[in-house]
Amino acid sequence: MGSHELFHAVQAGYAAGQDLIVSEATAVWATERFDPTLNDFEAFIRRFLERPERSIFVAPSGLVDGYPYSVSLFFRFLDERFGPEIVLELWQQLEQTPDVDDWVASVDGILSANYGTSFTDEYEQFAVWNVYTGRRANPTQAYQEGARYPLVASTDAELPLVLDRPRMFAASARYWRFAPGNRETITADLAPTDDDTEGLQLWLVPSGVNATMAPIKVLDQTEVSTEDVESMMLAVINPLQTGSSLRPTVCVGSPQEVEACKANAQPSDGGMGDDAGMPDGGDMDAGGSPDGGVDPGPPPETGGCTAHSGAPGGSLLWLLLGVMLWNRH
């Protein structure tokens, strides 16, 4: 039996018939965790990093497009933050609440009870970590193996930048990349509108010649120095686990440019605005799509569950894992 399928068998011993996303995502996470020589994890997470604007807990309504498998990146994040035991704790919690089809609420409860944090706080950190992938990897800031992961999709932009009401679904993020030019500092802020933007978070991540630097959360127009900075990423994050999508107007540039942008902002007219939030001439990096929400796509090239088979060493590790989980069960 392949390692992926063996973990499904272990899942069934705890709580059969769970949400497709949590079932497939934790199975892919486990395959990578116990047999990192396989390439399934890196192949699957590309789908997530190509579409960070999708809500992490909403599965496609049509054919499975690989997105449920790609959410394994979130469980890798939790593993690196809190250790692999958190996945076992999740399945134990799902066993205790078999009639509750809400794995995000279960994760939130575990984080609150056992780790002193929340899904909202951790999703925000997760979205920031995803900047540190591919050539922007920095293990001092995020994933230890981030250099092996695909780049998160981002949009090329020029300053000053006005993002006109991009749709921000619950538990999703969007990214823009720009050069600071001759500005000494860069900041960002939400422009006043009639739209509810409570809970939305803004982060700036500067990059220098040799490394992507520490991320900076923008609070009250925090000014970020551009000294030794070649480029910068803006992460707009909706970390909320429930609620309708948010439609912010975001101003980015020097402090003076941001103040002027906010002064010129008009309350929304109830229209849809620029759903992509993409400036004229913007280009997506890493093959991402600016469209929000969920849509069916082609099946992943690596296939579904039946495509996963581990090396003999991995199968042995999985057998030991299954026995360990079953004994604790």
Kindly give the residue locations of the regions a language model identified.
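Short, well-ordered loop/turn and helix-capping segments at boundaries between secondary-structure elements
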Residues: 12, 32, 36, 80, ...
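Active-site-proximal alpha-helical
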Residues: 50-133
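Ser/Thr-rich, Pro/Gly/Ala-heavy low-complexity intrinsically disordered linkers and tails
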Residues: 266-322
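C-terminal membrane-anchoring or membrane-association module
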Residues: 321-329
